[in-house]
Amino acid sequence: MINTRSQDIADISGIKFHIVGCGAIGSSVATQLVRLGGNNFVLYDFDKVEIPNVGVSQYNEQDVGLSKVGALTNHMKKINVMIEIEGIVDKFKYYHGDKDDILVLGLDSMSARMEIVKLLAKCPYKPSFVIDGRMGAEQYQQYIYDNITVKQYEKDWYSDEDSDPEPCTRKATSYCSNMSGSFISNSIKNIVMKQPYFKQIIFNFSTMILDKKKLIS
């Protein structure tokens, strides 16, 4: 087993993970979850890998021109060929899951995030948890929602025009994207293993300050 060293710490094998957006955040969390023992995934992204993606995501130059979903599937299968992956090369239009799954939002656009949350809120079997990761070059933000509603999400949402100059911009760094995957994977481990987790975290690389709020125990 590839997760021999972590299987007693994190048993996430019974969870289906939905990764919406397979760019910097999505590719990082997907590959880390595979290494941690995740074995059932649904990947959503309509875009293709471009050269700038190589510098901030889990892709390489051989992936350029491929769909992000296809390229990420290849990388995940190279880690563990036995995992199950459903790839949807399209925008998120409806939720392919049930109430016990976990969904990760890793998009660049705040408006796209809100549209997805509105779709999820209408689902009879929405995911048990939605983890919203937002990153810039030097700062990462993360919000966790259980039984998500639009009203709940609006409290932490802002428009693309009013967004912070850091999170969800075109600027990005490899270390911030890798750390985003680590934060999300750790939060998922805590949720699944019924350990305490923070519903909101903000980490700034320039100051190395981690701000944590709303501890759930």
Where are these regions (language model features)?
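Adenine nucleotide-associated cytosolic modules
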Residues: 1-217
